[in-house]
Amino acid sequence: MRGTLATALLLVASCRIAAESNQINPQQASHHVGTTLNKLFTKSSPRRFLRDNREQRVALALTAANESRTIENAVTSAVHGITDASTTTAATRDAARDILNQHAFPKEGIRPQFDLNLPPSETSALLTGASNIPQRNHAFSSITSGIAVSSSRTSNQRTAKTQANLDMSHQGTVRKTLSKTQFKNPAASKSTKRRKKARIIPPFVVNKVDTLYREHLTAKSLEFDPTIKETEAMLKLYVESTVDPLPVSTVHFNHFRYFKDQDLTLLKEKLGTTLESALSTLAALNLPPGMLKAIERPFVWYASLARWRAMYCDFFEFLNANSNKIATSLPNVEFFGGETSSTVRDQLLATLKEEMKTRTKTRRNGKIMNDLKVVLAKYNVEEEIKAAIRGLGEQFLKRDHEIIPLQRHSRRSPASQSRSNNQRTGLTPYGLQIPGPERDSFRHIESNKHA
């Protein structure tokens, strides 16, 4: 805008000089200026009108080179340069006014109407007020708005305020680089990579192994009845050789903590009628619904953990004995070969058998008794009922050898098998057995409540 205004002011000054000289008739001035329909048409550069006025041309150049000159000063200087408006023709004045209006103020809504016939002081006041009209900020000029910039495009002089504002805008647009680089722990990276090497078992492999294992359970008269998810979990633990095998108690605990009520109901059906009878005895005490489910959960967890340990041992023994048969029945013959070593399999099986021994029961026993203690402290019930529930937990743990027999159902002698069938009719080989005196104590509590 400043360049356009400077050009318009040069045209105004040129018109004034041409009018003041009054040496050329309008007919003779057609070589330089032709006035048609109030339009100014120049056939040559405006500097030709200043050719014979060296002093005024030098003064105008010095004024344009002034670094402290603003738009208001430029407008005031141009208006005062038109000393005598009466000597100029009407066409020249109208042409200069149109150029100033169109180029200095391109928007017609904010364009002021200048009258060059007014005295210089009044015209200067109008131009100075018009220069303060607010205009739309451009995207590139919004950062440095309010900064006084020189009218000359070749100037490189800046005030302290200008330099400070430019520095602030530069800091706001430049992205800060990180001075520190965070490095991961090498041990953590190795453990993460090692954990990611867990093999993904295709569904058709899980289904085939599950079918063969069910045939094995039917032939051995074992009633584990694993689900497809349990078979997949056992198979993943078997083929995983890049990490240390987790104890079955840890795997089962992480799996059991997300069980819902319907999952517990389905699981209780696989743990035998002995556990169901014990839980039904608890239900006969008319405990609050929330307390009854909280009391059932530790018993179901312990019984299902016993089932898992026995089932894991049997499953790994089955895979070790039938690995060739399983591999040949699969499209991918090399699924069980190469990566899983016999040393890892033996270590995993030894870990499972170690968990089944009596010396590893202390931690599990403490957990079930602590869970019962937390539940009893949470609910307000009679002390006699609390004592009966604690006694049920102690008797439950003392008969751990009956809950997890080391001898499989198929390996028992006919005499022991007949005795077991007479003692526990309709029970699975890993069911729970609640002694008779304990049931009598619950009957005593129930009779006292009805009395």
Curated annotation (Swiss-Prot):
One of its GO terms (cellular component) is extracellular region. A motif (RxLR-dEER) lies at residues 48-69. Residues 437-451 have a biased composition (Basic and acidic residues). It comes from the Eukaryota. Keywords: Glycoprotein, Host nucleus, Secreted, Signal, Virulence. Residues 1-19 form the signal peptide. Residues 175-194, 404-451 are annotated as: Disordered. Residues 175-184, 413-426 have a biased composition (Polar residues). Glycans are attached at residue 66. Coiled coil: none annotated. It is found in: Secreted; Host nucleus. Secreted effector that acts as an elicitor that induces cell death in host plant cells. The RxLR-dEER motif acts to carry the protein into the host cell cytoplasm through binding to cell surface phosphatidylinositol-3-phosphate. Belongs to the RxLR effector family. This is Secreted RxLR effector protein 111. It comes from Plasmopara viticola.
